[in-house]
Amino acid sequence: MRTTYMAKPGEIDRKWYVVDATDVPLGRLSTVVASILRGKNKPTFTPNVDTGDNVIVINASKVALTGKKAERKIYYHHTAYAGGLKERTAGDFLAKEPTKLIETSVKGMLPHNSLGHKMGLKLHVYAGAEHTQQAQKPEVLDITNLI
């Protein structure tokens, strides 16, 4: 009798990938990164287990915002005080905190529960070309053929 393989947390082999965000549209970058963080690129994908890999995104400040998203796309957050609704445009977000822009975009594509939080912790975003995870020997992932 054949049964469906269900991954167990101790059996997961995690890899490290480096993704260059230079001139890649934000949404397309985010979908590829979120898919890798979830583990959907592996044959051992199990929805209730974190089977994903670690992803390092470099050159976050050079990500592309297509169309007029830089002026028209607005990110909101609330300070929890009365009248504390704050808003920023995507262009302002990219200029001031490019790493947080990509983190927000990717984490919005992950499950909104404790498992999604664990997946989000495996995302490392850097504004420049240098990163601090050389010891993990990450593989360079060319996402132009994945988008």
From Swiss-Prot:
GO MF entry, a single one: mRNA binding
GO cellular component terms, semicolon-separated: cytosolic large ribosomal subunit
InterPro entries named in the record: Ribosomal_uL13 (IPR005822), Ribosomal_uL13_bac-type (IPR005823), Ribosomal_uL13_CS (IPR023563), Ribosomal_uL13_sf (IPR036899)
GO BP annotations, alphabetical order: negative regulation of translation; translation
A family per Pfam: Ribosomal_L13
Gene3D superfamilies per record: Ribosomal protein L13
Entry keyword set: Ribonucleoprotein, Ribosomal protein
Signal sequence segment: none
UniProt record similarity statement: Belongs to the universal ribosomal protein uL13 family.
Subunit organization: Part of the 50S ribosomal subunit.
Function: This protein is one of the early assembly proteins of the 50S ribosomal subunit, although it is not seen to bind rRNA by itself. It is important during the early stages of 50S assembly.
The name this protein goes by in its record: Large ribosomal subunit protein uL13
Organism: Lactiplantibacillus plantarum (strain ATCC BAA-793 / NCIMB 8826 / WCFS1)
Encoding gene (name): rplM
